[in-house]
């Protein structure tokens, strides 16, 4: 049987030999769509020099019905918010007959660009739950495995070309919460959240700021903590440090998530201040643990298990549609007004 050459593939596709050679080497100088077409044709023709990485990539896109292994990468996050997302991922993978490989990435591994050994095996897709450094993401992308991200860096453009991105709507929901505080007569409204960490927290701040500006209120930077914090304000001492820098106590504090809100409420209680009588507090995430804390927290319901399922659904779609443009998908949320923001202030005050 005649050996299939690069020239044979080029002739079949009416492409130049140089273009085909680059495509078979998975070169970024050739468009994604062209690489896929060339690799697929070469495989069908029996071209024997496809690299293992490229061959693996081809198999992912053409043996959709085989049992797939999906790798989930995440930091060992402090918040319980992530547990139910992983449960949703697991349930949806089971529904699709897929195997789950869950990998916790340590701070040291991320810093040293150490990837899980799982990625060296036959993996069909990756779900990334944490916002890793650009350098670490670049290492992952070298495996040419389809990726779906939950959330993104504050500068979302850093990863839009790498894979599909699922983002919980944050801007409008936080604007709605802040507007409600304003309508209740509050004007001195603070914010706590590390906007350098991820897009959703950045969007939450923009929603908060937008509500103030539309109401003719200038945001007071003295009661706004958006700086980089080592654990993104997931530790009480970081929240306490931020609050201790406030020159005065705001009428309300809008928090980027429920964990921050909990630490704020505990801090206020330690200072003899009451929520919402003295200070209104709001969160985001609607974590189950907050249902045991009084006063009940005004927050945003994400639907974590549903979100986990949605990540898998997007990855399954991507495996079947590899050459479609990458997508950024916003998932709807629900604002829940509760007792923690129910105070009203006379505008005359």
Residues of each region from the PLM?
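Short beta-strand elements in bilobed, periplasmic/extracellular small-molecule ligand-binding domains
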Residues: 93-105, 209-235
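Flexible loop/turn connectors
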Residues: 240-349
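Alpha-helical recognition/docking segments in bacterial nutrient-uptake
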Residues: 1, 58, 62-179, 242-248, ...
């Amino acid at each position: 049987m005649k050996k299939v050459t690069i020239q044979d593939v080029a002739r079949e596709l009416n492409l130049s030999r140089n273009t085909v050679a680059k495509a078979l080497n998975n070169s970024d100088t050739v468009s994604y769509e062209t690489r896929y077409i060339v690799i697929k044709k070469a495989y069908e023709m029996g071209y024997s020099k496809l690299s293992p990485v490229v061959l693996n990539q081809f198999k992912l896109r053409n043996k959709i019905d085989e049992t797939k292994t999906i790798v989930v990468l995440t930091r060992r996050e402090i918040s319980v918010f992530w547990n139910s997302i992983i449960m949703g991922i697991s349930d949806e993978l089971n529904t699709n007959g897929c195997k789950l490989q869950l990998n916790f990435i340590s701070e040291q591994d991320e810093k040293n660009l150490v990837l899980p050994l799982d990625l060296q095996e036959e993996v069909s897709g990756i779900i990334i739950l944490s916002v890793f450094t650009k350098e670490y993401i670049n290492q992952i992308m070298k495996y040419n495995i389809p990726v779906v991200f939950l959330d993104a860096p504050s500068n979302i453009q850093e990863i839009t070309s790498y894979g599909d991105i699922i983002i919980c709507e944050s801007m409008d929901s936080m604007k709605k919460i802040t507007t409600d505080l304003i309508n209740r007569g509050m004007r001195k409204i603070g914010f706590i959240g590390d906007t350098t960490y991820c897009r959703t927290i950045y969007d939450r701040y923009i929603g908060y700021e937008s509500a103030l500006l539309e109401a003719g209120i200038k945001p007071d930077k003295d009661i706004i903590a958006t700086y980089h914090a080592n654990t993104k304000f997931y530790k009480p001492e970081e929240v306490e440090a931020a609050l201790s820098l406030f020159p005065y106590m705001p009428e309300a504090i809008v928090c980027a998530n429920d964990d921050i809100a909990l630490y704020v409420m505990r801090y206020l209680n330690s200072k003899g201040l009451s929520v919402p009588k003295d200070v209104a507090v709001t969160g985001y995430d609607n974590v189950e643990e907050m249902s045991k804390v009084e006063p009940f927290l005004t927050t945003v319901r994400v639907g974590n298990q549903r979100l986990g399922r949605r990540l898998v659904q997007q990855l399954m779609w991507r495996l079947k549609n590899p050459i479609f443009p990458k997508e950024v998908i916003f998932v709807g949320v629900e604002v829940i007004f509760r007792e923690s923001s129910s105070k009203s202030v006379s505008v005359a005050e």
